Amino acid sequence: MPDFILTIDSDEEVDVSDSEQLQDINPDFKFQIDGETTNTLEEFDFQENKVKEVDLDEIIKKKGGLKEESDDEELALDGFGMGASKQEEEEEEEEEEVEVPEVKEVVEPEDSAEAIADFYEESSPQQTHTSFQTLQLSRPVLKGIAELKFTKPTPIQSASIPIALLGKDIVAGAQTGSGKTGAYMIPIIERLLYKPSTSTKVIILTPTRELALQVYEFGKKLSHHVNNLNIGLAVGGLNLRQQEEQLKTRPDIVIATPGRLIDHIRNSPSFSVQDIQVLVIDEADRMLEEGFQDELTEILSLIPKHKRQTLLFSATMNTRIQDLIQLSLQKPVRIMIDPPKSVASKLLQQFVRIRKRDQLKPALLYQLLKGVSSRVVVFVARKETAHRLRIVLGLLGLKVSELHGALTQEQRLQNVKNFKSLEVPVLICTDLAARGLDIPKIELVINYDMPKTFEIYLHRVGRTARAGRDGTSITFVGESSQERAIVKSAIVNGKGVAKTVDWKQAEETNKLLESKESVIDEVLEEEKEAKELLRAEMELTKASNLIKHEQEIHSRPKRTWFKGEVMEQLTKHGKKVNSKKRKANEVRKDEGRSYKKTKTDRMKISNKKKSKK
């Protein structure tokens, strides 16, 4: 993790792969409420030198927020304010706009029946297992399964485990929360029971640190009764030296993100992948996208192909055969578990028609959250919105956490932990940050901003009304045809009602918010100053360490780094490029300059012509 303080410098949450289909990238990332899911993570340091964080709650308290008051109405009447004015928000949006040349969408042809038959192994009827005992697993593995409170295999586990135990390659797709992690981890641990523990045998690749941490946690619990089986973790954001020491022990299984794995292969002398027998790619759809293409190619070139079993798992495995060929799969078995096309039967969908009252949304959200003690997830479109709402609601006395890409790794995990323990009952998050987030016992989901597609809507509201429990979703609906179409699909596929709202009360609350806009600006400014002070302290400490330990630093072997094409595109003059600018750069690279030449451009061309003469 770099030594700098993360800031919220752009409205949109940007994904490295820049995928427009968010429903296709949902990591099997579960935080189990009923278990102690963060205990094993305490063995890791999040950084070699701890980065201090700004205590935003303390700033909010100084401004009069987060008071332990019994009467929420008194807090509301105290009149704490909303954030930037509408004009300022529009100016921020304009800064994000970049003229992008129009690109025609290329529709990839679907794989033919002949190509599918030639590439995949011919499917044969499989036994449906209703018990883990019928899978003929060993006693230590069954004990681990029992401690995880698994009673019977899920459809993806029933279909995948027997095939994986045979050593065959697998291409599998199943929705988030279907048990994909168990589908590959159970057969891996079962197979390792009978192999000597002399070197690393299994690599599990995940696209995100959170998913890697969750898989690591799951594997540790599942293998609790297995003797002499070690699991290692190699992800960014955790102590590099500590990971190197762990990899020196040659753990049987290494769970890693692509970049950090390449780093260790290149720079950790005691770590080798020459004996790898199983390669698992979790969220394979996303890993095969352009954002991870270079890293994946590098890893595949380093891991021996012979006698390697490859297991691909994803929420929606719709990758074309042409993209799978590079993985050197040997007649893989294709397993697809269809996701539901409707909401849970016990979910009550409520819709609030906003019309042209967008300015009342913060006040309306406050009304809905007053007095809430159960877990509530609020979805927003932008990380800036999540941060601002956290401050506003905090000033009004509500305990709220945020989850988005501008937070550090430690902040994200701590916020989720606080949410799980009900220390903070409300979590405001973006779709990208909450990919695959599966926390049981969520009673209410609020769509503050409407999702882009019905599939994303299903993923959002699917976080409540799980395991036969009742649940409620409340969605703020605008006037666009796209939003109306999503509501229509939701009602057709489940029960939905219009929610009655006291608009008069919302307007009164909004007036109080508008009258105190300066308060939120003061909080944001104080937070910014505190971050700048921390950054200066860190730079001073870094410079001091460079002088103090100069000899030791120069004596270390130089590390080599891998930087693919996408990382080159992501940075320009040391600054992050947002998604719109990146798209424009990609088009210009492919098609040449398609924008108007500037005065500087014309002068360069003129000088070139003169030099030729």
Swiss-Prot record:
The protein's Enzyme Commission number: 3.6.4.13
Name of the protein described by the UniProt record: ATP-dependent RNA helicase DRS1
Signal peptide range: none
Cell membrane recorded as keyword: no
Coiled coil location: 504-552
Matching SUPFAM superfamilies: P-loop containing nucleoside triphosphate hydrolases
Claim: RNA-binding is one of the keywords in the record: yes
Lineage: Eukaryota, Fungi, Dikarya, Ascomycota, Saccharomycotina
Gene3D superfamilies in the record: P-loop containing nucleotide triphosphate hydrolases
Any Pfam family the entry gives: DEAD
One of the GO biological process terms: rRNA processing
Record gene name: DRS1
Record function comment: ATP-binding RNA helicase involved in ribosome assembly.
Reaction equation(s) it catalyzes: ATP + H2O = ADP + phosphate + H(+)
Biased composition annotated in UniProt, kind: Basic residues: 572-583
Species of origin: Candida albicans (strain SC5314 / ATCC MYA-2876) (Yeast)
Swiss-Prot/TrEMBL keywords: ATP-binding, Coiled coil, Helicase, Hydrolase, Nucleotide-binding, Nucleus, Ribosome biogenesis, RNA-binding
